[in-house]
């Protein structure tokens, strides 16, 4: 069964995801952003991963149309880090439901990058059981470039710099995460 759990405020996303997972009855969970398109090739890749029984979960590379040059540059940096460190992007996280519950789900204290923390937790859980967490690359998830179009390169770079210099303080305070929470739509 497929269930959707809408939320009133974007700051509730991690709460909505955890609430949805708590109500889910399946062996696997799939979290996908509303502004993303799960294409048939990617869905087939996910189903193969589930059937092979060798993975605790996965994320996917992303594809965004219409990025400015600086947005494409930042996007390629993220893509490289995602593949290298096996970090799922928040737009798509797939995992075993028992693993999700055992690691505590999405971190309730983080307003951004909770998918990275979850990726790390799932990798550790999987290692203990001989399972891997992978990033699928053959059929990227189509997702929106909306945030890149709403903010200047300077604003996005400043946001990234705040996260790098003061990660805990920034990621735990919505006021420090203007690109996600200042209300621009």
Where are these regions (language model features)?
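Hydrophobic helical membrane-anchoring modules
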Residues: 124-185
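The conserved acidic donor/metal-binding loop of glycosyltransferases
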Residues: 33-37
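Short, conserved alpha-helix that lines the donor NDP-sugar binding/gating region
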Residues: 13-22
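Short aromatic/hydrophobic "clamp" motif used to bind/position activated sugar donors
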Residues: 29
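A short, conserved alpha-helix in the catalytic core of glycosyltransferases
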Residues: 99-104, 109-130
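A recurrent flexible, glycine/aromatic-enriched loop bordering the glycosyltransferase active site
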Residues: 2, 57, 61-66, 78-98
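Short, small-residue-biased leader/transition segments that mark boundaries at the very start
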Residues: 3-10
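Conserved donor NDP-sugar-binding/catalytic core segment of glycosyltransferases
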Residues: 40-70
């Amino acid at each position: 069964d497929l269930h959707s759990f809408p939320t009133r405020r974007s700051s509730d996303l991690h709460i909505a995801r955890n609430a949805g997972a708590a109500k889910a009855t399946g062996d696997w969970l799939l979290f996908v952003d509303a502004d993303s398109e799960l294409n048939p090739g990617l869905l087939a890749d996910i189903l193969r991963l589930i059937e092979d029984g060798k993975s605790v979960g996965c994320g996917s590379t992303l594809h965004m149309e219409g990025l400015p040059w600086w947005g494409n540059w930042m996007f390629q940096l993220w893509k490289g880090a995602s593949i290298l460190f096996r970090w799922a992007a928040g737009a798509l996280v797939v995992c075993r439901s028992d693993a999700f519950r055992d690691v505590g789900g999405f971190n309730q204290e983080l307003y951004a990058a909770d998918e990275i923390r979850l990726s790390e937790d799932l990798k550790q859980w999987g290692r203990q059981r001989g399972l891997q967490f992978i990033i699928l690359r053959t059929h990227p998830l189509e997702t929106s470039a909306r945030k890149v179009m709403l903010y200047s390169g300077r604003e996005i770079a400043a946001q990234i710099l705040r996260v790098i210099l003061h990660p805990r303080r920034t990621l735990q305070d919505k006021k420090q995460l203007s690109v996600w929470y200042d209300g621009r739509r």
